[in-house]
Curated annotation (Swiss-Prot):
Any Pfam family the entry gives: Memo
Name of the protein in question: MEMO1 family protein TON_0132
Similarity annotation: Belongs to the MEMO1 family.
Cross-referenced PANTHER family: PROTEIN MEMO1
Amino acid sequence: MVRYPAVAGSFYPGDETLIEMLEKFFRDLGEHGSERKITAGVVPHAGYVFSGYTASRTFKAIYEDGLPETFVILGPNHTGIGSPIAVYPSGSWLTPLGEIEVDSEMAKTIAKLSGIADLDELAHKYEHSIEVQLPFIQYLAEKARTDVRIVPITLGIQDEEVVEDLGKAIYEAANELDRDVVIIASTDFMHYGPAYGYVPFRARADELPHRVKEWDFRVIQKILDFDVKGMFGELRKMDHTMCGPGGVGTAIVYSRLAGALEAELLHYTTSFEVSRSTDAIVGYASIVFRK
């Protein structure tokens, strides 16, 4: 079973210019490491022109720390189709850089240990939040001359109960299979503006990106503190439009269980830096969790 790309040529290049773009993102790439202290990372999932550099900061840190055997990649289900908690069961995913194999044993073990997840490929058919991460992983695996597999999981329900269940299931599955795992939580932060039907504050055009950043950093601080309850609390308090808190919460729960002691914000930006539009501003962050 092959999952074909849904957004190649739109969110990211579908031709040879993809490699050129990745080379620019990673021109400061260091040596492939072996420490393996990173347990999880947070990345955005907008078009590469807006958030690709920010995403590359997370993957650069993981590469220099040492690539794992398996990336468990969690993203929000924007389409609404398929199972609410959908683990892609087996096969491979295709991108312009080739195929990347699904770790089917890990996928099935997570679904078995979870009380809420299903094995389901339909939820992934048109979803972009996981697909856009794969070229980064493929490019770096080629650099490291190593094989890396993935477990894609889409989340249509995102709350404290879900993240506690999934974080624990992923941790227990990794232990049961003796698998070296890094979680990738795919999320964009605030979606501000009339285009998103979300205008919680008014400000002069030149002040808006700073206000968006202020609101995002209230959430980001909770993430850096490993505070799942606090993160969801801030989101509810602000009616915040972060789209992937479930993946981030799962990454925090897993990282705590895996012995992570610190989290670091590597990069933050907004779409305004590229678009210069105040009709729609989206926040993007790169974060890693380390032992």
